[in-house]
Amino acid sequence: MNWLTNVVRPKIRNILRRETPENLWIKCPDSGHLVFYKDVEANQFVIPGSNYHMRMGAVARLKSVFDGETWYDIALPEVTADPLKFRDERRYVDRIKDARAKTGLHDAVKVGYGKLENFPVVIAVQDFDFMGGSLGMAAGEAIVRGMELALEKRAPFILFAASGGARMQEGILSLMQMPRTTVGVQMLREAKLPYIVVLTNPTTGGVTASYAMLGDVQLAEPGALIGFAGARVIEQTIREKLPEGFQRAEYLRDHGMVDIVVHRHDLRSTLARLCRILTKSPAAEIEVVTPEPEPVAEAAVVLPAEAVAPPPAAEAAAPPATPPA
């Protein structure tokens, strides 16, 4: 029996076993309910029911904004992969290789050029799945290149921020990207080109101390964590309890740090409207079809007999004129 139970039965189970995808279900962080992954993906990674906004990858984000889900990928300049030869538990170059294999991205920022409701725009997206969306030399170069393209095309520049801050493996070289991107923002401002920032969950650290909080209009997704230092660090520093909802998008909106909190489903139309307002462009022409009214049969009005007037006598026809002799 040992041979049957220990050898044969496991082999039969392996034959009959069906592999289940790891990402078949997603657990909502807000409600704790399990949701079918395809339903969440089809809903732009917003949990149906709870409306919790999950993190969204760079490619999926660009697809959700650009017309026809098409755009031109912007070639980004190469930078030194590991200038400091940094190593902690693992080598920095190995971490980059793993992040590239996981996300399919070259670095944490992806830049595209296309049309948003037929309006040309340049969009840069930070992907939190690539080493926490951290700001390094490659990410800084990508953002600056996107701003330069916006200047060249005379197009608005839109940035979706999602980051844990500066990339510590690059030291002062990553911190240098903060003033570089700030100079890029100033160039857009001098050219009178709109710079719109969408703060997503999370946006923290040195990113919030530079380009992420310098937009002409600051948008945020519902419930996004936005701040410089963590809440626990602040509480330990000031020795006070922070208010409820501190560093969330709604709290920042109520205290003047964010202009609008926009649901992800409304972001596309909101961004297009802002671009047209800030550039003083006419609204997109929408063909309005007015349905033809259906003819209504007139109801017959019955009058009393005494109110009905007799028809007028027919006038005698005039004799034809006699031509002159």
Swiss-Prot record:
Residues 24-293 form the CoA carboxyltransferase N-terminal domain. One of its GO terms (molecular function) is ATP binding. GO terms for biological process: fatty acid biosynthetic process; malonyl-CoA biosynthetic process. InterPro entries: AcCoA_carboxyl_beta (IPR034733), Acetyl_CoA_COase_Trfase_b_su (IPR000438), ClpP/crotonase-like_dom_sf (IPR029045), COA_CT_N (IPR011762). Keywords: ATP-binding, Cytoplasm, Fatty acid biosynthesis, Fatty acid metabolism, Lipid biosynthesis, Lipid metabolism, Nucleotide-binding, Transferase. PROSITE patterns: COA_CT_NTER. It catalyses: N(6)-carboxybiotinyl-L-lysyl-[protein] + acetyl-CoA = N(6)-biotinyl-L-lysyl-[protein] + malonyl-CoA. Component of the acetyl coenzyme A carboxylase (ACC) complex. Biotin carboxylase (BC) catalyzes the carboxylation of biotin on its carrier protein (BCCP) and then the CO(2) group is transferred by the transcarboxylase to acetyl-CoA to form malonyl-CoA. Belongs to the AccD/PCCB family. This is Acetyl-coenzyme A carboxylase carboxyl transferase subunit beta. It comes from Rhodopseudomonas palustris (strain BisA53).
